[in-house]
Amino acid sequence: MPNAEARRTTPGPLEVVEIERGFLREVGSVFWFIMNTLQESMERVQQGRAPFRAASFFRESVRAGVDSVPLVGLVCFFLGLTMALLTGYQLQRFGTERLIPGLVAIAFTRELGPLITGIMVAARIGAAFTAELGTMQVNEEVEAVEAMGIGPLRFLAAPRMLALFLLAPCLSTVSNLAAVFASSLVCKVYFSIAFPYFLDLVKDSLLIRDIITGILKSFMFGLLIASIACYRGLTVKGGAAGVGTNTTSSVVTAITAVIGFDTVYNVIYTNFYPT
C-alpha cells in the first residue's frame, strides 16, 4: 500500500511536461507584459505626451520607496547585528575578527542587501499592487479606462513599474547602510574595533564591482516584482476570491523570481569574476 501511494503521488512524465509548459508560459506572459507596457508608453512619448500622470508616479514612489524605508532598515539592521555576532565569535577563535567589517559589507552590498530588500518589497509592495489593480479589474474600472481611450498598461502599470524600478536600488542602499552600521556597533562593543578602523577595513575590502553588482540586481528585482504584481492584478478573474488568489500567487511568484534571478546572476558573475 505505501508503494502504491508513492506511485500515485509521484508526478509522471506528462505532469512534468505540463509543469514546464506552465512555467515557460508564465515567463513569456510576464516578458510580453513588460514589452507591451514599454511599447504603449513609448508610443505616447513619441506623440509628445506623457505616458502617465506625474502625480501617479510620485504617489507610487512614496509608497514603494519612502514608506518602505523603516521596514527595510530595521530588518537589515537586525540581520547585520546577527551576522556580525555569529561570524565574529567564529573568527575570533582564529584571531581574525578584523575580517568582520569586510565580510558584512561585501555580503550585504553584493548579495544579502538586494535579496532581502527584494523579498520584503515583493511581500509588501507587490501584494499591494496586485490587490489594488485586481480590485479595479473586478469592479470593471480597467474596462472604463479602456473605454475612455486610455491604455491601461501605460496609465496603471507603467508608473508602478517605473517607481519600483528606480526606488529598489535606493532601498537596497538603505539596507546595506543599516547592516554595516549594526555590524560596526557589534565590532565596537564585542571585539574592540574602533569606528575609524572599522571604516578603513570596509573600504579596503569593498570593491567597485561589488557595489555595481548590488545596484544592477536591485534594478532587475524592482522591475521583476512590479511587472509580476501588475500582471497578476490586471489578469484577475473570479471576483473577490480571484483577487486573493492572484495576490498570493503574485507574492510567491515574485519571491521565487527574485531568488531565481539572483542565482542565475551569481553563476554568471562567478564565471566571469571567479576571485
Label for each model-derived stretch:
Residues 85-109, 176-219, 223, 227-249, ...:
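Membrane-interfacial helix-loop-helix connectors in multipass membrane proteins
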Residues 132-161, 240-243:
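Short cytoplasmic-facing helical segments at TM-TM junctions of multi-pass membrane proteins
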Residues 60-116:
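Active-site cofactor/substrate anionic-group-binding motifs, chiefly glycine-
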Residues 100-139, 143, 228:
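Hydrophobic alpha-helical transmembrane segments of multi-pass membrane transport proteins
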Residues 65, 69, 73, 112, ...:
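Selective transmembrane-helix segments that form parts of the transport pathway or gating/packing helices
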Residues 77, 81, 119, 123, ...:
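Hydrophobic positions within alpha-helical transmembrane segments of bacterial inner-membrane proteins
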Residues 9-57, 232-233, 237:
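Short, membrane-interfacial amphipathic segments enriched in basic
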Residues 243, 250-267:
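Final/C-terminal transmembrane alpha-helix of multipass membrane proteins
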